[in-house]
């Protein structure tokens, strides 16, 4: 299964790219994590933030590969323990379909993105900077996979 992390924003700080790559590169081909960056719309002083969110949301939806399961990351979504996420990952891997994870920009996800999702997932009730979400997601996917495979990375 390929996991497509579709995220708004390009040109992340070096530490974000390094941390994301650290975990993404640990995953095997059976559960590969690939980043698709969606260019953020420029925000000016009097920017129409609703229009910007709609534009970015439409670009995200266009980037979803055909026949993917779609999981939208949103603070109002469902939260999972590590064990629950590991079971979900196992189900997704056995579905025979790829997975798309949607991470919005500063304005969050649009209603259309949430409606397209098969699941809306909340990493935490806290608000995280969007670049950091990439790192957290990569680490949590790796942790869930390592738990499935009995790898010593995750400890109860």
Swiss-Prot record:
GO terms for cellular component: cytoplasm. It is an enzyme of class 2 (transferase). GO terms for molecular function: rRNA (pseudouridine-N3-)-methyltransferase activity. Keywords: Cytoplasm, Methyltransferase, rRNA processing, S-adenosyl-L-methionine, Transferase. Its EC number is 2.1.1.177. Coiled coil: none annotated. It catalyses: pseudouridine(1915) in 23S rRNA + S-adenosyl-L-methionine = N(3)-methylpseudouridine(1915) in 23S rRNA + S-adenosyl-L-homocysteine + H(+). Pfam families: SPOUT_MTase. It comes from the Bacteria. Its main location: cytoplasm. CDD domains: RlmH-like. Gene3D superfamilies: 3.40.1280.10. It is found in: Cytoplasm. Specifically methylates the pseudouridine at position 1915 (m3Psi1915) in 23S rRNA. Belongs to the RNA methyltransferase RlmH family. PANTHER family: METHYLTRANSFERASE, RIBOSOMAL RNA LARGE SUBUNIT METHYLTRANSFERASE H. NCBIfam families: PRK00103.1-4 (NF000986), tRNA_RlmH_YbeA (TIGR00246). Homodimer. This is Ribosomal RNA large subunit methyltransferase H. It comes from Thioalkalivibrio sulfidiphilus (strain HL-EbGR7). The gene is rlmH.
């Amino acid at each position: 299964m390929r996991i497509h992390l579709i995220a708004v924003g390009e040109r992340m700080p070096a530490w974000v790219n390094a941390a994301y790559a650290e975990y993404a590169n640990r995953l095997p081909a059976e559960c590969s994590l690939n980043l698709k960056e969606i260019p953020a719309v420029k925000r000016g002083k009097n920017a129409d933030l609703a229009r910007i969110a709609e534009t970015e949301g439409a670009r995200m939806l266009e980037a979803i590969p055909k026949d993917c399961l779609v999981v939208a990351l949103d603070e109002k979504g469902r939260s999972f323990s590590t064990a629950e996420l590991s079971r979900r990952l196992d189900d997704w891997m056995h579905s025979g379909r790829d997975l798309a994870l949607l991470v919005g920009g500063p304005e969050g996800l649009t209603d259309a993105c949430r409606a397209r999702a098969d699941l809306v997932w909340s990493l935490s009730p806290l608000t995280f900077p969007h670049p950091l979400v990439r790192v957290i997601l990569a680490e949590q996917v790796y942790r869930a996979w390592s738990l499935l495979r009995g790898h010593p990375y995750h400890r109860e």
